[in-house]
Amino acid sequence: DNTTNTPAQLVDLLLVNSCVSVSNIAISSNQSVAYFNKNGSTFPINEGIIIRNGLVLNTQGNYVNNSTLSSQINTNTDAYLQNISNNSGQSSTITDVAFLEFDFIPVSNSFSFDFLFASNEYGEYQCGFSDVFAFVLTNLNTGVSTNLAVIPGTNMPVTVKDIRNKLYNTNCESANSNFFSTYNPTNIPASTLNMRGHTVVMNAASVVTPNVPYKIRLVIGDYNDSGYDSAVFISGGSFTTSLDLGPDQTACSGNTIQLNTQLDSSYTFQWFQNGNPVGGNTPSYIVNAPGTYSVEVTKGSCFLTDTVTINDLAVTAPNNLQTCNTGAAN
């Protein structure tokens, strides 16, 4: 559906109750950025946002091997995508760029979301070249940007060249094929979208600094020409931020430990020790006894919680030692 939702509504669909403050929302075009749902199919994401370097409406329905595999909306370029493409050994221009972007302020130190990559380059063109996409997270205070659209456990960008199965093109070996899911031309009646192939659902994640402004830019482009589109599907409600009180700790008797949410006083706080309410409505709490501590944080519809265990460092009395000196006296 590329007509019903405004850019703000699309972002709301991604965030749901993820407790972030959002601003400066922008999309390239509602022809290339839109809402989707799996419509009763077996597609692995129930609903969310699709961003395609072409017409998103060409993606719906079963796989059809015709002109809908390729389309062009614009001739825009993108410097960040071009750099990724160049670093992969490609030399032609990235064009037909589509994006969704917005600024946000997290309330925790972690940020993540789920996504799936699909492309019509799978099969015939998976050995030679690939379209490029990125999830560019920028710290607006430092200007430092990071691409979160990488193969899990690596720093390799997600592309058809880097996630492929040689079953569908024997001219090149498989690469990270455990992340490849489905090649639709081999089973058209069971296909869930009109694209040749797609990956499994992956998770993009990053450490962030609470109360610091960031920009996230979800962007995709065509390599070299407008032929054989690619798309990224982002799961609705998967943009999450979580509260982290830190790891479980062990403390000596008589010592204190400060648990800190790193949030400001505009939130409401309720602390618990072993399930019982303790403390005041404060962002931090001083622990002076072992136990299981948790906090519930609310602000409007935002709700966050975390739990940490504080153990007592048990010190046992040492065993008595005896020695016998059998040497000659001096």
Model-flagged regions — what are they?
Residues S238-N330:
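Proline- and Ser/Thr-rich low-complexity, intrinsically disordered segments
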